[in-house]
């Protein structure tokens, strides 16, 4: 599995798991420079921040990707009780008794990557791209590299098809993720037109939820020392 930035395509077609947030939009922007066809797949699971679906649709049109599928997986909402699936549960900055944030949706990335794998199979795509990140992850076990490796192996074995799950952000911190968007001259688009906020506010968000805190801290760090952070991003590329 490739977790680093790639400089040339691994396949002519890629499926990007695309929420309309900072991370997946940055991955989508990069993929457009690397693949002949980029297909986005967005999941409607009855999420608290439902505005992200419309944001994803708008960005898909704006960036002129090959196709964009919105898939109804609201059955996940019936099983996975979380602050992101229940409006009555406030988003908390504290961890639950099990050590996880209350915004964790159990099984979400298992389901998303499985469905993205099936979609890639039908399209003849050899790559799934997802914006999960272990460096600055929010405590979600399904954002870890070991999890992604296990999912890739399961998909390859289960569908008897060579398929890579590519995670361009896995070892980047949030400041480097901003640098990556800037590298492709899309920092303003990512800053002002994506939706990361758990409370559904586009751009800089509510400023209070954990997602907004992480996003803002990364942006502040990048803007304070763009040259050094861009250099650290470049150094993380293969053969740098």
Swiss-Prot record:
Catalysed reactions, as listed in the record: 7-carboxy-7-deazaguanine + NH4(+) + ATP = 7-cyano-7-deazaguanine + ADP + phosphate + H2O + H(+)
Coiled coil, from the record: none
InterPro entries: QueC, Rossmann-like_a/b/a_fold
EC number: 6.3.4.20
Domain of life: Bacteria
Co-factor: note: Binds 1 zinc ion per subunit.
Cofactor requirements of the protein: Zn(2+)
Keywords: ATP-binding, Ligase, Metal-binding, Nucleotide-binding, Queuosine biosynthesis, Zinc
Binding-site list for Zn(2+): 197, 206, 209, 212
GO BP of this protein: queuosine biosynthetic process
Residue positions binding ATP: 18-28
GO MF annotations in UniProt: ATP binding; ligase activity, forming carbon-nitrogen bonds; zinc ion binding
Pathway recorded for this protein: Purine metabolism; 7-cyano-7-deazaguanine biosynthesis
Record carries keyword Nucleotide-binding: yes
NCBIfam families in the record: 7-cyano-7-deazaguanine synthase QueC, PRK11106.1
Task of the protein: Catalyzes the ATP-dependent conversion of 7-carboxy-7-deazaguanine (CDG) to 7-cyano-7-deazaguanine (preQ(0)).
Family according to the record: Belongs to the QueC family.
Designated name of the protein: 7-cyano-7-deazaguanine synthase
Originating species: Shewanella baltica (strain OS195)
